[in-house]
Amino acid sequence: MSFPISRRSFLQTGLVAGVSIKIGFMAPRAAAALVDNGIPPSPGWIDASGHARFRLDAIAKVTGQKTFSRDFRARDIPGWPATQSHAFLIHATRADRRFAGIDLAGLQPDLQPDRLVLAADLARDGVRVPQPDFYGDVFLVPQGETPRLLGQPALLIYKDFARYDAAKRKIRLDDSVVRYGAVTGPKPPPHYGAARYVRVEGPTQDARDEFSALEDAVIFGGFAGDKVVWPAADARAGGMGKGMAMAAVIDEEIASAGDDALMLKRDYFSQSIDASAMEADNGNVWYDPAAQVLHAVLATQSPHEVATNAAALVTQSKFSLKAVDLKAGYTVGYGTKDKVIFPYFCVIAGLYGDGLPVRLANDRFEQFQMGMKRHAFWIKDTLVVDRKTHRFSVMKAELKADGGGRANLSFAVGIVGTTAAQSIYYLPKSDLSIAVLASRAVEAGSTRGFGTLQTMAATEMLVDEAAAALETDAIDLRLANVFRSGMKNTQGAVPAGALRNDEMLRKAKTHPLWAGRETRKANYDATHPGRSYGVGFAQVQKNYGSGAEAAVVTLELDRDGRLTMRHAAHEMGPGVTTSQAVIVARVLGRAPDRMSYGVVEWPEMPLTSTELPFTTSQATEDELQRNPRWTPTFVSPMATSNSAYYFGHATREAALVLLRYGIWPAARALWMRGGGKIAPNMNGPEDLRVAKGKIIAGDLEPLQLSALAAKAHELGAVTGACVHAFNRREWAEAEFDLPGAGRVGLPVDALAVKYGDGAAPALKALMRVGGFHFIERATVRYPPVQRLNAGVTRYAPMATLVELAVNIATGEVELLSHHSLLDCGPQIVPSLVSGQIQGGVAMGIGHALHEFLPLYEDGPGDGTWNWNRYQLPRASDVATWTQTAEVLQPLSDSDTPKGIAEVTMIAVVPAIANAVHHAIGKRFNEFPITPEKIRSALS
């Protein structure tokens, strides 16, 4: 298929056919839709063996055709008015006094806004924040109240760009525009939560733990001011009281540690940063009051959630709504466009646009001012090690995170960071706690790493220091304590799959950078006066998946063998559109000819959901699942490194349904033509293989997919499959009564199929739900709700060796080279894995050495921050041409891919800190490690 060069042509082919989906929990007349983002594949992108030669969208990228949400104007979108209005927000730069209103006297009359929107307007019109416990109680600060955070008191709308641009420039840094009243001190929302994971192992590895989160309880605390109040300890009780009693036992063991134990107590700090996605937050929204339709083009990682929340926002207001038409362009966010409030500001702008499309798009100053940040963490770690065996006996971590002025995912980030604090080690006793505090800072949320970078970096630095105190090799100490397959994590759960941390440690120990580090240091220091050489190592493992992952995929095979795929995933940059197509090719011998991603409309999958997968009780879920059309959640956002394993599972299962119940009957019929006999050892679809784009089995004739498709249609076999999958630390499983096949069990919770053209009328009559036969499940088994207490069960590990030099005079750090080891299971697309390693390591280098944001009044909330002040790593900072990596070979043909988008950036951070210590003998427990800090330490 050709890929036209014109941007306008791309818009027309990729972003036109918007259709509506019904949202179960909304008013009956309201609906939401998303244009399915059709992607014509670049010619020759995949070879006959199913390997991607380059990205599916590669030619679009290099010819300028890859459009982002930010590229759209009203005139680019068929059916929209040609006139484009523009809006911007005026931000409160003080959050310690009352907001007294807006003074636009500094703007001459011709620059006054066509519409000024204040909190009072929203209150009058019933425009309220969806999920106020998550996104905050107000969009705009009410007059007379103190801003909850360094935020937004007003929205200005202009009907032409020139006036908008001139006004924005004139008042950008004008402190007189926002008027303030009495000083009140900060008034942030209540703190977001406190949790504690206590584990004490049982008498043997297989025995029940004396206490763990999985088998007993996660301990939750309240707040008295900024202090956490934990439940009372009660050893005779169950649940949280018993957990607090076990925590007291751990405290006693730490306090009584004798000379035979090494005890280290250290404080660490990890700073707030901006993920600096190249596309800033933006949206373009047209509310058509005559048709009562809200049209939107928005940059988001979670289009399904945005569509449903936007519909809910409007339907509860005075504005009438029949449909939401959400068009999704490509975007990139590193987590910062997942569950963020900005799309709803865009919706508000559209509602007050007087029937014209309104574009609200942050420039880089504004993105720093209100874009999602990585959480600052304060960490107090305690580690007790047996001096004789070098085994860890106890670890205690007391963590505090600043979530800023909106709750967002802060508590979830804190919990995930807490459960990750064990890094790659087995801990017999552990007490890991987190307090997530609210403040007036810019909100923090789902930024790459999700709290684990902060906590695992601290652990890896602590372990290196312990090795030095014990006078042992740092990798040997890690090997003595490595978390192995079958062991329990700090939540009491046994991870799924084989853990290969020990294998990676052994590889790292024999790598020339590590094995020869002392000789290399002596030689380098002798030949480079004024510079000091160091090598550092760290290894981490990052969970992937949220604990409630869901995906939906449809595959259809036409009579000529052409495949069409509709997918809930959408492209965020890492290459999900390419990888999901390759998964199909690996199963069916051919990649889809036509693909639509970011699809929200699923008429063939008529499921309902309460969308409370983390909080529904077991009793309630047991009752809900009696409805064969219920699921805990319909689709996940693109986050938590979930595409390769979780979305890929749904893709693979849809392809396997086609293979087993469409391709196999067709292949068997073709191989038995003319009275011939199928090979006696060919028992079923499990014998089918893909080779050079054809379906083969044993020594039978290879078959083209086109021939198989024609026969499948003739037979009336399955030629289309839509599956919905749900995972709560394990896959939901269901049984379906599939015509012609009997009762079949699948690792999915919903199934719909389409039958071929030759199907009997009775079968065709069943295809009445979006053209498919939705087969209500006969039985279902959802993983128990208690599985959520496992915290995580799937890990992807990565290790990084760093070689650097410190300039003794200036304190500057130069990375000379780095080498990484990664276990990602089978690589779906190796070049995409390489890109994740390179990009992740570069981002980690920025966190370790360069990037920093103050939290409060002198931070990004004041509107003066841009890349002129915020230092990102450049190519010269990341050892571009001397970096190497090794990806472990998969354990078997059936090994599953792992999500790696986050783990790739973490290990390099503590590895740099450990290398700096090796270079100059000084330890740095706060990031970033700047030249100023190094000079101070050396002075």
Regions found by a protein language model. Give the residues of each.
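C-terminal catalytic domains of large/alpha subunits in multi-subunit enzymes
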Residues: 120, 316-323, 351-358, 413-448, ...
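Glycine-rich loop/linker segments at domain edges
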Residues: 57-59, 63-64, 132, 240-283, ...
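Phosphate/diphosphate-binding loops
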Residues: 356-400, 649, 653-676
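Thiamine diphosphate
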Residues: 308, 330-361, 368-369, 378, ...
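FAD-binding core of FAD-dependent oxidoreductases
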Residues: 182, 186, 325-344, 366-370, ...
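N-terminal export signals
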Residues: 2-3, 9-30
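Helix-loop-helix junctions that connect adjacent transmembrane helices in secondary transporters/permeases
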Residues: 203-315, 482-560, 786, 800, ...
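Flexible, low-hydrophobicity surface segments
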Residues: 25-217
